[in-house]
Amino acid sequence: RDVYKRQIINIIEIKRDKTMEEKIILPQNTRLMGALLGFIGGGLDVFCHMHYRSLVATQTGNLLLLIADWHDPRVENTIMRFSSILFFSIGFLVALHIKEYRKTAFWRTKMLIPLFVVTLLIPLVSVIPPVEVPFIAFGTGMMMLTFTGSLIETHPYVIFMTSGNYRKMLTALYRITRGKGDLDEYRRQAMNYGIVVGSFVAGAISVAILMHFIHPVSYTHL
């Protein structure tokens, strides 16, 4: 009996240790990080659409714009959308190569440098949209690969295209209203995906408001 009891105790302790390990949230998987990445994702595409009439993160959106505006007399818009798709793809593939041959644990930080440098330099140079868009798209492609498979706590999400996050939030809310299953887990899912979706929308609105006031002023000083 003593041996049997010890075995049961060991099994319980092992399960408890595994549960504790599962509850450990890495720094990149916190709600704060999810909110920041969602904010950046929403703000980046709104800025590029308002400033360049092109998207850099939602490339399916660029394809739709190309088809919908095929009669657009401004060839510059078409060129920027094509270049955005091309350089986003190149940036994503370059980042994929770097990830496969990484030799340091800080590879994610290095792959954020291109987008960081571009966003610092753009306000300092003259307005040349056909040149600026490819660089932003390249850095965004690298960032997309860097955060592929991102988690907010234990739930996977996408930092740029938030339709999937919104769908998961609605699914969790529906299950909560049904009152069946693990309600605590569903509430946590709804909260986490709600944070990502809310921060994405907040980033988009914030940039749109800033562009309304800053954009005309910036042009008067060029």
Residue ranges and their predicted role:
Residues 1-7, 220-221:
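Conserved small/polar residues in nucleotide/adenosyl-binding loops
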Residues 16-17, 21-222:
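Alpha-helical transmembrane segments of multi-pass membrane proteins
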